[in-house]
């Protein structure tokens, strides 16, 4: 009877110990995975975003907007007040 009792409590303890050793081994592989996703994400986002957005946006907006608004605006506003001032004097 003594020999059987000793074998029973001896077999269950080693099982839970092995499981605990595997748990701490899983977190280490996750660490090197975090920097790998950030590296290819940073250079890939600003590269295609910066040159593709400002290039077609800057020349298309100021070109047709600036010459069409200031040209007819100052030519009709400047001569009107200039003539009135000279007539009053």
Curated annotation (Swiss-Prot):
Annotated signal sequence is none
Select a single GO molecular function from the record's annotations and give it: structural molecule activity
- State the compartments where it is located: Cytoplasm
Q: Which UniProt keywords apply?
A: Cytoplasm, Keratinization, Repeat
Coarsely, its chief localization is cytoplasm
* GO cellular component terms, A-Z: cornified envelope; cytosol
Q: Where is this region: 6 X 8 AA approximate tandem repeats?
A: 31-78
Task: Map out region (2 X 12 AA approximate repeats) in residue numbers.
Answer: 3-29
Q: Which family does it belong to?
A: Belongs to the cornifin (SPRR) family.
Protein name per Swiss-Prot or TrEMBL? Cornifin-A
Q: Upper lineage ranks?
A: Eukaryota, Metazoa, Chordata, Craniata, Vertebrata
The encoding gene: SPRR1A
